Regions:
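C-terminal motif of bacterial Sec signal peptides marking the signal peptidase cleavage site
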Residues: 22-25
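Short substrate-entry loop that stabilizes the transition state in hydrolases
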Residues: 109-115, 120-155, 303-306
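Short alpha-helix in the alpha/beta-hydrolase fold that links the catalytic acid
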Residues: 305-314
């Protein structure tokens, strides 16, 4: 049965979005969760903003009833009496905005001694209590640790600035406060955060000379590319960001306005300028000139801050650096460390700070510069760098389908001059699945999205398939589909799904990519779709396949009208599938 893409979009996207909000709101009532996880999650719920703005800064969530006891249990295992905690910090930014913070310090500070310091920046929709467990761990090791809520979140004042100039000013004010009020070693200050905090950390280490190093987890390099990569709005994650921002913070109206512009493909130049100011990629030259070291963790199934833009950002850096690419959706590979659980990413983060801020030769710089975790929670592979000398691009040629056969993925060039036409207006069985849910199942529970490609609608989609592979195909990085297309309306969305097809004929979704066009009706245009990077071994004897269609629930379509999409096949301009592989 075919379901129109508008209906599918409403059902799948809406269900996933409200499930996400439901889980956020009632997670503390789940009787099956561990007490430690409950406490930590409860600590993250913003509140008491009115009390703060009225001057009662001490009435924080950390000091109230059941919330206080839950938060206490989250880091009680770390509380051995070796550190102190101050929950009444208020820092005034340059424009007078109140920034809420907390401070962990080693107990019995030695007069005149300076201490290495780490600043934690909250994730989107969370607050200064997000990192209480990591802060306690670091304080026990002799660090001063300050965590703060960015403006617009928690009990900090102001409107959410989305890593803009005001957020930079706030970070500088935090550094001023540390110097004036603590025994900070000003030559050994690090910064870290997850998601929103990661982006601000990368921006911070790039512009603030007082910050020596950064650890960024699930962050972004290019904000426009994250929200509008290949001219395609990230519908699901955009709605989550906007919804969570309104539910938990005080949103600057420009944020929703800009997302609306992306959905309508309006004033893209203006949104691009707004996003560039908030992108670490815009400050690469400054960071490279400073030589400051950076450790980055990113997740392969992060469809918000997708892995391709983080790989490109990492490749542009010439500073001492390390990159771990993990299985997981946005922030899921790192969240365990926030809850105090064993986590290799956080272990590396602690070692990174110990090496760069305390001079401890712990072997962190002897570890591989780049690691990729294999798809479906597999083992890690190591690479000497990125781009890697061990990875090359293998190119296949795409041959058009015929009346009775699907298209072919071949090692030899296409010799036929044929167009393959499909219609929009209906989804196919080629899909990323149910947003968030399918992504989590695949990345953490090894339950892949599958499709019997023989049943894919030839009216609404195209399949290309290879012969059985004679040897293992070790994918290490990006996959690129390159071709020529035209649309009867000039607008079109092209989604490319890459499958590992076993002997049973069922395709296992390995990765996908998307791109949209906005040209004149029937105008032929070159199009490249970069599929999300992945590490995966396709076994010998299996086949590889790709499916093309015009809708996926993760993304906003360029038009609600039905259009015809022509995919061109021309011997003089080959359509190709290029795979980065070992």
């Amino acid at each position: 049965m075919r379901i129109g893409f508008r209906t599918t979009s409403v059902l799948k996207t809406g269900a996933s979005f409200f499930l996400f909000l439901f889980l956020m709101s009632c997670g503390s009532e789940n009787e099956n969760s561990s007490q430690k996880n409950l406490a930590a999650l409860a600590a993250l719920i913003p509140g008491n903003s009115a009390a703060f703005l009225n001057g009662n800064a001490s009435a924080s969530p950390f000091q109230q009833g059941i919330t206080a006891s839950q938060i206490d249990s989250a880091f009680q295992a770390e509380n051995d009496g070796s550190f102190t905690f101050n929950d009444s910090i208020v820092i005034r930014s340059g424009d007078g905005t109140s920034i809420a913070a907390n401070l962990f310090q080693p107990k019995n500070l030695v007069s005149g001694q300076k201490y290495p310091t780490v600043i934690f920046v909250n994730s989107w929709a969370l607050n200064e209590y997000e990192y209480i467990v990591p802060a306690a761990k670091l304080a026990k090791k002799g660090y001063i640790v300050l965590s703060y809520s960015t403006r617009g979140f928690g009990i900090s004042g102001g409107l959410i600035n989305t890593a803009g100039i005001k957020d930079r000013q706030d970070l500088s004010a935090v550094l001023d406060w540390l110097r004036a009020n603590t025994q900070v070693d000003s030559s050994n200050i690090g910064i870290s955060g997850i998601s929103y905090g990661a982006g601000i950390s990368l921006i911070g280490v790039s512009f603030e000379p007082r910050i020596k190093t950064a650890v960024a987890m699930s962050g972004w390099g290019d904000l426009k590319r994250s929200l509008y990569g290949n001219d395609t709005p990230r519908l699901v994650w955009g709605l989550i960001l906007i919804g969570a921002g309104y539910f938990t913070g005080r949103m600057d109206p420009v944020i929703a306005d800009n997302f609306t512009k992306l959905l309508s493909h309006n004033d893209i130049a203006g949104v691009t300028a707004w996003a560039a100011e908030r992108s670490p990629a815009s400050l690469v030259s400054e960071l490279n000139a400073s030589g400051k070291p950076v450790y980055i963790s990113s997740n392969f199934e992060d469809f918000l801050f997708n892995p391709n833009q983080m790989l490109d950002y990492f490749a542009s850096l010439t500073v001492p650096k390390k990159l771990d690419m993990n299985e997981g959706i946005h922030a899921t590979a790192e969240i365990g460390g926030v809850l105090g659980l064993s986590n290799p990413i956080w272990d590396n983060a602690y070692d990174w700070f110990d090496f760069w801020l305390k001079g401890i030769n712990n072997g962190i710089m002897m570890k591989p510069t780049v690691t990729f975790q294999k798809r479906f929670n597999g083992p890690r592979v190591t690479l000497p760098s990125w781009p890697s000398s061990t990875v090359s691009e293998k190119t296949y040629y795409l041959k058009p389908r015929t009346l009775f056969t699907d298209g072919k993925i071949s090692s030899t060039q296409n010799t036929n001059n044929l167009n393959t036409g499909i219609l929009s207006g209906a989804d196919t069985i080629a899909t990323t699945g149910i947003p968030l849910i399918s992504d989590i199942l695949a990345s953490h529970l090894e339950v892949p999205v599958t499709a019997s490609l023989d049943w894919l609608s030839r009216i609404n989609g195209i399949v290309y398939e290879s012969n059985s592979l004679s040897s293992v195909l070790k994918i290490r990085g990006k996959i690129f589909w390159k071709g020529q297309v035209s649309s009867s309306l000039g607008k079109a969305n092209v989604n490319v799904y890459f499958y590992d097809v076993g002997s049973n004929g069922v395709g296992k979704l390995i990765t996908h990519g998307t791109a949209s066009i906005y040209v004149s009706a029937f105008e032929t245009t070159d199009l490249t779709v970069d599929l999300n990077a992945v590490a995966y071994d396709v076994p010998a004897g299996n086949r590889i396949a790709i499916a093309l269609d015009t809708f996926d629930p993760q993304y906003a379509p360029p038009t609600a009208l039905v259009y015809g999409l022509d995919v061109k096949h021309n011997p003089s301009k080959q359509s190709t599938l290029s795979i980065q592989s070992e």
